[in-house]
Amino acid sequence: MFGQSSRFLTKLYRKVMKGKKVAFPFAYLNDLTSDLQSLRSDAQSVDDFLNIDLLERALALRALNLIQSTMADYDASNEPSKVKDNDVFYQAKVTMTRAHLKYLQFFLFRESYKNHSFLDNRIVSQLDTVSRIFCLSDLIEENSCGALFDTGFLQAGSLRFMNRALEKAVADLRPQMVPLAESLYLPDHWMISVIGNKEGDIYEMQLNEAMKTRLNKDEVPEYFERLMMPILRAKL
């Protein structure tokens, strides 16, 4: 999947660099031709890093910087294409593609609800909190926000504020976890869970599923009891 996504992303990059526009949901890639180094964030507090628009911009800029820098080095290399794809720039292309897909996940999720008419408008704020947690945790993970420091978009000390913002977002969401989890009606026969059914019959449910498995429908070879069971019992 990463290979296919990387090749498609490369095609989009080539298209943008030729002066052509790409459409939804890839429109953010049109900024590849702009000066990313000139963009600055004025975020200097925990509340600033809870601004969902700023977080969306941060995810986009991280992906743009990684794509721009990786493809510039890729095109400057004199190695054969296969060597560049499978060896020299393999990990760099995986990293840029992952950043691209993470942004698309965030963007498409937010697009799916921000203009939706909910019976209770308070749901939007809870989904915004989910989006904040997704974005902040991904930027903080393994310091993957390094591309944003590289462009100068984030100021020194931003990582500390991001960690505090993530803690606050998780604390805000915690009381809403059960309502969010139960907001969709998922019958037991549709979405089986290893933690049991809606009545909490965990072991009974697991036993029923195990008894219905196709492995129990075949005839057991006669040598299983004679040769295999002694070994299994010894290990037990």
Residue ranges of model-derived segments:
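Flavin-dependent oxidoreductase catalytic core characteristic
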Residues: 1-236
